[in-house]
């Protein structure tokens, strides 16, 4: 019975919309085995809300592996223990399907390599920015090339620490994407493209200050501002308290601050800014995770 540990992920990192993602040191665990009948057991985050039938995203992902390798599907038992908050912008759905894909691949003897796992996970998730770092770890830049996803992984600079402020309310990716415009100004597109390029160079050279300066965005965060009460105030509070950069984590509502080493004032400042807008949140300090999903 494979036990798979899958990291949380934060996507976009400011300018890298649907392109950049990073693994974080917070994990979901999934056990998977063949069974006489389908069974899904869920504990932890989402225990009372995540579907337990065969429509469950992890169960569907497991069956997709059988189809991918040309094997007839068999009933499966999945035991999921979730520590990643659901629908908060920390890659909970990516973790579920990646855990199932990696675990099923292990059951079948490992016929799929990392690139094939990323491609299958992207097909199921719809975009690679969470699933790629969940599989590969570190910071991953991804691009679609026809039917293929091209990924390159970077080790994260030592000394980087993140602080996440996780509001108690959920925000679905569907709603968060629904507020985005179909077209953007050329000037805004160039603004983001240039910053993604320099951001990746900063990561590669370990320049945390430059990395922080480049984590700004004009393509998605301004449009999502009305969906998250206090977002602008939380950004400002985190920077004032010592963060190098602050961005939305994925499509939100979680806000993530990037810091040089531990900055004990950042988390309380973010929580206080949310509280002033009537939003309760949980604050966690999370190290970047340089490994992806692992079979234990």
From Swiss-Prot:
Belongs to the GHMP kinase family. Homoserine kinase subfamily. ATP binds at residues 85-95. It comes from Moorella thermoacetica (strain ATCC 39073 / JCM 9320). This is Homoserine kinase. GO terms for biological process: threonine biosynthetic process. GO terms for molecular function: ATP binding; homoserine kinase activity. Catalyzes the ATP-dependent phosphorylation of L-homoserine to L-homoserine phosphate. GO terms for cellular component: cytoplasm. PROSITE patterns: GHMP_KINASES_ATP. Pathway: Amino-acid biosynthesis; L-threonine biosynthesis; L-threonine from L-aspartate: step 4/5. Transmembrane segments: none annotated. The keyword Cell membrane does not apply. Its EC number is 2.7.1.39. It catalyses: L-homoserine + ATP = O-phospho-L-homoserine + ADP + H(+). Keywords: Amino-acid biosynthesis, ATP-binding, Cytoplasm, Kinase, Nucleotide-binding, Threonine biosynthesis, Transferase. SUPFAM superfamilies: GHMP Kinase, C-terminal domain, Ribosomal protein S5 domain 2-like. InterPro entries: GHMP_kinase_C_dom, GHMP_kinase_C_sf, GHMP_kinase_N_dom, GHMP_knse_ATP-bd_CS, Homoserine_kinase, Ribosomal_Su5_D2-typ_SF, Ribsml_uS5_D2-typ_fold_subgr.
């Amino acid at each position: 019975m494979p036990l798979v540990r899958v990291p949380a992920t934060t996507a976009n990192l400011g300018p890298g919309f649907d392109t950049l993602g990073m693994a974080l040191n917070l994990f979901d665990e999934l056990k998977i085995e063949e069974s006489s009948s389908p069974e899904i057991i869920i504990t932890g985050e989402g225990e009372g809300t995540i579907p337990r039938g065969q429509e469950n995203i992890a169960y569907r992902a497991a069956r997709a592996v059988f189809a991918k390798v040309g094997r007839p599907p068999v009933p499966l038992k999945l035991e999921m223990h979730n520590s990643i908050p659901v629908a908060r912008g920390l890659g909970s759905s990516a973790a579920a399907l990646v855990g199932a894909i990696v675990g099923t691949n292990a059951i079948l003897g490992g016929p799929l390599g990392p690139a094939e796992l990323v491609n299958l996970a992207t097909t199921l998730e719809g975009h690679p920015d969470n699933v790629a770092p969940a599989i590969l770890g570190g910071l991953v830049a991804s691009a679609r090339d026809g039917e293929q996803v091209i990924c390159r992984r970077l080790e994260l600079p030592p000394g980087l620490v993140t602080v996440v402020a996780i509001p108690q309310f959920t925000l679905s990716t569907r709603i968060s994407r629904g507020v985005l415009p179909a077209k953007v100004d050329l000037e805004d597109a160039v603004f983001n493209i240039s910053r993604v390029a320099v951001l990746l160079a900063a990561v590669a050279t370990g320049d945390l200050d430059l990395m922080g300066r480049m984590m700004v965005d004009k393509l998605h965060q301004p449009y999502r501002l009305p969906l998250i009460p206090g977002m602008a105030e939380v950004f400002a509070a985190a920077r004032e308290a010592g963060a190098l950069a602050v961005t939305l984590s994925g499509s939100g509502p979680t806000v993530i601050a990037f810091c040089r080493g531990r900055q004990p004032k950042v988390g309380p400042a973010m929580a206080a800014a949310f509280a002033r807008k009537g939003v309760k949140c949980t604050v966690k300090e999370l190290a970047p995770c340089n490994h992806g999903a692992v079979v234990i």
